[in-house]
């Protein structure tokens, strides 16, 4: 599990009681986000920069940036077409069964990270609809 993922998700989840409207939709201050990323790139020991900020929008932006910069996307280039095809299946039961099987087929590192992040999204969407609407989750992943 990448430390940046567990750290950012943990900070976001710890702030769910506050007004976190548009956690993954609203852009954070780009300059601050870049400063935090630079510190983290120097050493994950500098991850305290995120914890000190306690700003969910910065954490969400750092997390989105991390996923965008992966050399092989979380849902892998190889399996991506199958995920897209599965998303178009009308029958809920069939669609979920196929998507679960595709997630299981992910490489181990991707599987663990995807499982953790999807659980995080479930926590957020289940906590308060203003934080992340369930119908919008597919946009972010």
Task: For the regions a language model picked out, list residue spans one by one.
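Alpha-helical catalytic/interaction cores of small GTPase-regulatory modules
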Residues: 1-141
């Amino acid at each position: 599990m990448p430390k940046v993922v567990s750290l950012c998700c943990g900070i976001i989840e710890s702030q769910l009681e506050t007004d976190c409207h548009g956690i993954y939709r609203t852009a954070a201050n780009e300059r601050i986000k870049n400063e935090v990323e630079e510190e983290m790139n120097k050493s994950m020991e500098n991850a305290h920069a995120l914890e000190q900020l306690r700003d969910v929008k910065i954490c969400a932006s750092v997390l989105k940036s991390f996923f965008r910069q992966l050399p092989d996307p979380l849902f892998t280039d190889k399996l991506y077409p199958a995920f897209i095809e599965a998303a178009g299946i009308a029958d809920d039961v069939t669609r979920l069964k196929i998507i679960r099987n595709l997630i299981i087929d992910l490489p181990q590192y991707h599987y663990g990270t995807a499982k953790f992040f999807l659980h995080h999204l479930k926590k957020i969407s289940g906590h308060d609809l203003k934080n992340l609407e369930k119908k919008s989750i597919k946009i972010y992943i």
